[in-house]
Amino acid sequence: MVRLREIPRTATFAWSPGAASPLIATGTRAGAVDADFSNETCLELWDLALGNEDAGAELQPVAKIDTDSGFNDLAWTDSEDNSRGIIAGGLESGSLGLWDADKLLSGASDAVLSKSSKHSGAIKALQFNPRHSSLLATGGAKGELYISDLNDLENPYRLGSSTARADDIECLDWNKKVAHILVTGSSAGFVTVWDVKTRKESLTLNNMGRKAVSAVAWDPTKPTKLVTATPHESDPIINLWDLRNSHAPERTLRGHEAGVLSLSWCNQDPDLLLSSGKDNRTICWNPQTGISYGEFPVVTNWTFQTRWNPRNPNFFATASFDGRISIQTIQNTSTETAKAVADQNQALDGEDFFAKAQSQPQVSSFSLPKAPKWLERPCSSTFGFGGRVVSVNLLEKGGRASKIKITPFEVDEAVGKSTETFESALKEGDLKSICENRITSAATEEEKSDWRVIDALLSDSPRKGLVEYLGFNDQAEDVSEGLAKLGLSKEDEVNGEAAPKESRRPGARKHKRLQSMFDASPDDNFLSDLAASKGAKTNNPFQIFNGEESEADKNITRALLLGDFEKALDHALKEDRMSDAFMIAIVGGQKCIEKAQEHYFSKQTESPNYVRLLASVVGKNLWDVVYNADLSNWKEIMVALCTFADEKDFADLCDALGDRLEEQIRNTGDKAIRKDASLCYLAGSKLEKVVSIWIEEQRENEQAAIETAAEDSSFSIHVRALQSLIEKVTIFRQVTKFEDSERTKDCDWKLSVLYDKYIEYADVVATHGRLQVAQKYLDLVPEKHPEAEIARNRIKLAMRQPTTRAQPATSTARVVSNKPLPQPAAYQPPTTFSAGARAATPTSYAPPAPAANPYAPPAAASNPYAPPVAASNPYAPTAAAANPYAPSAAAPSQSTNPYAPAGGSYAPAAGYQPRQQSFGAPPPSVGGVPPPPRASSQSPATVTTYTTAKNLPAWNDLPEGFAKQPVSRRGTPASSAPISSPFPNQSPAVSQGPPPAGAGPQRTPSVPPPPKGVPPPPRMTSPPSAGQAPPNPLSAVPPPPANPYAAVPQSPSVGSMAPPASIPRGSSPYNAPPTIPPPSNRYAPSPAAQAASPQLQARAPVPPPPQAAASPYAPPPPAQPLAANPYAPSTPPPMQPPLQQVPPPQSAGSRPSTASSVKKASPAPPKYPPGDRSHIPAEARPIFEILSEDMQRVKSRAPSSFKAQVDDAERRLNFLFDHLNNEDLLKPNTVQDMVQLARAIQARDYETARTIHIDIMTNRTDECGNWMVGVKRLISMSKVTP
C-alpha cells in the first residue's frame, strides 16, 4: 500500500495497454471545479517513470491537448497502425473523440483522429472490446448505446430501440470470455446484458428496488458472473450476480458507508476486486468469498474511479475529487516510515495542529492472506538442509492442489563416498591402512611427509619410528659394526664356540639407543668380575710404595687405602690425570662420576662438537641442543631428542625446535621447511601448531588445483582439500590420544582455526545428508562456540532430537526461589477470595478489595494467543457484566489443542454488547444520584488510570493491529498507522449522564466534525504520584492520547441507536463520529462513578495486579461488585465548578508527571543501531540467547492465525535486546534477575519466571518499557507451546 506517484488533477483516466513503461491518460472531469476555479479542459499524458528513483511523487504531464468539453470516461486500446495505441474519450458535450497516442507524445498538431457526435447527450461510459480492439461501445444519456468500429467510424450502430428512454446508461463492460456479450447499468436501476451479435437484449437482472447502478464488471474467468454497485447513500452495496439466477444476487458485499462509484475486477486474479465511492475510501475485496481484505489510504473527497493496471496488476490508480490521482501498489514496503509519520501526527497538540501537522495522506496497511495469482508458481523447488531437495508440483493443470516431493541430493557424490569410506575405516580401527592409502595417494611431498610421520607415530616405539623415518637407522648399524670390530661387543665363547644368539644379553647392543656412554658393555661393573680368591698367587709382585712415588701418588694411594675415593679423585683431577680420575670415579660412585664428568667438560674448550653434545646428554640439558645447535642439523637434533629426552620434556623440546624452524621460514621465506616444522609439532603432539601449517598448505594446494583443474569444480576441489585436512587431524588425535582441554572455555581458544574447519566440514557433510557425521565433528567444538551452537541445534532439529543449550557460566546473581516475592501493599490483591466473604475495607493505598479475585488466571484451556474482547469496568461500583472470557463449564482437558479458543471465549457477552435502551433515555445511575450537568463548551474531565497513562506500557497491553487508532481530524488527513486501540468501540471516558432537568430528549442523527475553534478532547495523563493532586483537565486542553492502547476520546453523544455494521477501518477525519457510546472499556472509569465523585481524581493510581491472567493477550476477568467508594460524597454538588489546581512539586522517588504541561525530553540516541547484538555484555548474553531460542520455538509452532501476536511479542523482545546491546535502561541487578528469569524459562519453571517478572515490574518500573510486555507474553506462550 505504497503511493508511488501522484497526478495533481481532478480527472478521469485510462492506463496505457502496452507492456512498456506505463503511461496514464487523463481527461478533465466533467463538472469538477479546480482549486483555482479554472474552466480549462484538456487531455494529458503522464509518464509514471517508475524506474526512476529520483523522480518526485508528483508528476508533470509529458503531453497535453486542449478539448472543448470535459470528460466522463476514457479508454485506451492497442492498434496495429499506432505503436502507442488509440485513446477514446467520452465528452460531456456528447462527442466521441479519438486521439493518436504517438502523435500526442511527439506534439504533432494532427493528433486528433476523429470526433463524432452520434449521441444526443453526454457520453457517460465507453470501453474497447478486449478481444476485438477495433470495437468501441459507448453509452450515455437517454439510454443511448452505440457500437463503433474504428475502421468505419461514420457508421456506428445502436443497440436497443431508437425511442428515447428516461434513464441514462451510467456504466458498461465487455464480457472477458465471450466477445459479443456486453452489460450496461443505468440510472434507473436496469442491469441489461446485450448480445452484440444479434443487437438485442439477452437478459435484465432483477435489481431489487430498481436502485441506480453506478458500476458493473464481469468476472475475468467466469462468463456468467458479474458485479454491480449502487451509488445510494442509504444502502451502498455491491452485488455479485450469476446469470443462471437473475432474480437475486448470489452475494452482497457491504463495507462502504456511502455510495459506491467505481469497480475494477483484476484480470489476472479473479479473487481481487477494487471498489471506491463517496465515503472517500478504496476497498479491496475477495468477491468469491465476500471477504474484505482491507482498505487503502482514505482521502479527503469522493473516489470516483479506480482501475487495475491491465499489464502489471501490482499497480492500480484511484481518482478522487480532492484533485489527485494516486498510483499505488498492493505491496507495502514502508510500514516503519508510515508508523513514524503517524505517531508524529498523532502526538501534535490541538493548538498547533494545523501549523505542524504533516501533509502526508493517511497510511493504511493490510496483508493479503494469499499471494495473488500472478505471483503464484505452478511448480517450485528449494534446497533443504541435510542434502534434500523439496519440490512442489500441481497435481493437475489449472488446479491449486499441489504435491510435495522430498528427494536426496548431493553436490558431489565423491564427497559422500569418501566420507563414508573414512568413517567406516575409523570404526574398524585400521589406522595403518588409512595412512598407507593416503601416503600412496598424496599429491605433494608435504602431504606425503605428514602421513609418513603419522604412520611412524603408529608404531610400537614412536620415537624409534621417528628415528628410522629420519634415516638414522643405517648409521646406528654402522656404528654397531665398528664397535664389534673393536671387540667391545664381542660375545663370550663357550668351549671355543660362539654363544647361542638367544643367550645374548639384551644389553649387548644397548649402544644403539645411546642411553649412557658407560652402559655399552654388558658388564655394569667390570671390577666385580675379578675373583677374590684367598689362594690367588701371581708371578707379578708389586710394592704399594717403592720410594719413587711423587707426593700426588702418595696422597692418592693413602686415600684409596682409606677408602676415601672422593679425596683420591680430587688429587687426580688436580694433577689432570683424567684417565685415573674416571677409573677412581667409577669405584667411588655416582657423585664422583658426576664430578669427574664436570671437570672433564670444563677442560674441553677446543674439543670436537660431539663433546658438547655429550655434555648436554650427560647434564640432561637438551635445551642447549635445541636452542643453540645449527638448524641445518635439525634432523640430528630431533634424533637426539628421540634418544635422550625425558618423557615429560619431550613434547616441549619438539615444540621449541618447531618454533625455531617456523621462525626461519618467516625470515627466509623457504616454505620447504614447513614439513620439517610440521614433523616437530607432530612428534610433540602440538595440534594447535601443526593445524596452522596444514591449513596454510590446504589453501595453497587448493588454489593450485583450481588453476590446473580441467573438469572439477572449485567446490569439489575445496571439499577434497578440507576432507584431507580433517582426516589428518582425526587420525593424529587418535594416534596421540589428544585431549582438548579448552572445550569448556568461552573464548580465546588455541584451536579456533580448527574449530572453524570443523564447523565448515560439518556443514558440507550435512549438505550431503551425513547428519550423524556432522554431529560427531560439531561435538569436538567447545559448547559455547556461537557458530557451533547454531549448527548443532540445526542438525538436532533435522534429526528430530531435542535441542539443548549449554548452561552459561555460573553467575553471582541471587537464585530466586519458587515462592512468590513479597509485594508492597499497593500491589496486593485481597487475601479473602471466598464468594461469600464480606468485601474488605479499602485502604488509602489500595483500591477497594473485590469479593472475588479479579486477577485469578482462567482455566488452562484459555487461549494465550487469543485477542482480547472488551469487558466492563471492574472498578465501577455497578455490578460487572458476565465474564465473556471465562471458559465454559465443559472446558476442554489439558490434552486438547492449547491454541484452540475456550468455549464461548469469542461469543459476545453482556459486557461486550452495546446498551439497548430507548432513544434519548438517560443511562442508569448509581444509587439514584444524578450526574452533574454537562458543560456545553468543554469536555468533562477523565479519570486517569494506570492503563490510560501516557507513555506507560501497561501490564495488560495487547498486540498492535487489533483495531484502528484515532485519526486526527483536519482539512488534509494526517498519516494514520495501522496500529490501533486494543479495545475497539470502547466508551468515551466522559460522563454519559442524561441532559439537565427540564431538557427533553433530542434526536441528533449524527455529530458533525468539531469546528476549528472547539477544544479537542482531554489528554490521557499519567496517574498522579502519592500525595500529588492531578492537574486540572479543564484548565489546559490537551491533545488526543499518544498511547496506542489508550481509550479513544470522543465527545459525548446524545442518542444510543446502534450504528450500521461495517468492516474494521480507521476513522476518517471527514466522517461524523458515532452517535452512541460503544461498549465500555473495562479499565476505563465508569461514567457514573466519574460523575459522582469529584474527589476520585485525587486518589492514588490503580496499580497493576501482581499476577496477570493466563492469557498473555487478554485482560483479566471482570471482578465482582466492589465495595462502596468511601471517598465519594453522598450527594455530589451538581453545579460545583472544577477547582483550578497546579500540580505540586514532586517528592523524591515519585514518578515524573506526564501531564500536558510537561514536555517530555527527547531520549539520547542509542550507541548502536537497532538489531545489533554484537555488543551485548557477557553477563547479559544468556538473556538474549535463551529468550531468542525460546521465541523461535514458539514462533515455529504457533498457529498461523496468531502470527500477529507472536510477531508483536518478538518485536518487543528486540527492544530488550537493543537495551542490553546499548547497556542502557536496565541496571546490573535487573540484568542478573533477567538472567535467572531466562534460565527459569529454559528449565520450563514458569512459576519462577513469572515471580521474577512481577518483581521487576512492580519494584523497578523505571526500567520497564515495551520489552516487559514481550517477556510476559513469551512466558505465557512458551508455557502452552509443546
Curated annotation (Swiss-Prot):
Regions of compositional bias (Low complexity) in chain numbering: 973-992, 1084-1100, 1152-1162
One BP term from GO: COPII-coated vesicle cargo loading
Amino acid composition bias (Pro residues), ranges on this chain: 921-934, 1006-1021, 1030-1043, 1071-1080, 1101-1120, 1129-1146
Record carries keyword Endoplasmic reticulum: yes
WD repeat start-end pairs: 7-47, 66-109, 118-158, 164-204, 208-251, 255-295, 298-338, 382-407
Membrane-topology annotation of the record: Peripheral membrane protein
Composition skew (Basic and acidic residues), residue ranges: 491-505
GO cellular component terms given for this protein: COPII vesicle coat; endoplasmic reticulum exit site; endoplasmic reticulum membrane
InterPro entries listed in its UniProt record: SEC31-like, SRA1/Sec31, WD40/YVTN_repeat-like_dom_sf, WD40_repeat_dom_sf, WD40_rpt
Pfam family membership, one: SRA1
Record's keyword terms, sorted: Cytoplasmic vesicle, Endoplasmic reticulum, ER-Golgi transport, Membrane, Protein transport, Repeat, Transport, WD repeat
GO molecular function terms listed in the Swiss-Prot or TrEMBL record: structural molecule activity
Region (Disordered): 491-511, 801-845, 906-1176
PROSITE patterns: WD_REPEATS_2, WD_REPEATS_REGION
Keyword match Endoplasmic reticulum: yes
Record's subcellular location: Cytoplasmic vesicle, COPII-coated vesicle membrane; Endoplasmic reticulum membrane
Positions with biased composition (Polar residues): 801-815
Family as reported in the entry's similarity comment: Belongs to the WD repeat SEC31 family.
Purpose: Component of the coat protein complex II (COPII) which promotes the formation of transport vesicles from the endoplasmic reticulum (ER). The coat has two main functions, the physical deformation of the endoplasmic reticulum membrane into vesicles and the selection of cargo molecules.
Subunit structure: The COPII coat is composed of at least 5 proteins: the sec23/24 complex, the sec13/31 complex, and the protein sar1. sec13 and sec31 make a 2:2 tetramer that forms the edge element of the COPII outer coat. The tetramer self-assembles in multiple copies to form the complete polyhedral cage. Interacts (via WD 8) with sec13.
Protein name stated in the entry: Protein transport protein sec31
Species, as recorded: Emericella nidulans (strain FGSC A4 / ATCC 38163 / CBS 112.46 / NRRL 194 / M139)
Record gene name: sec31
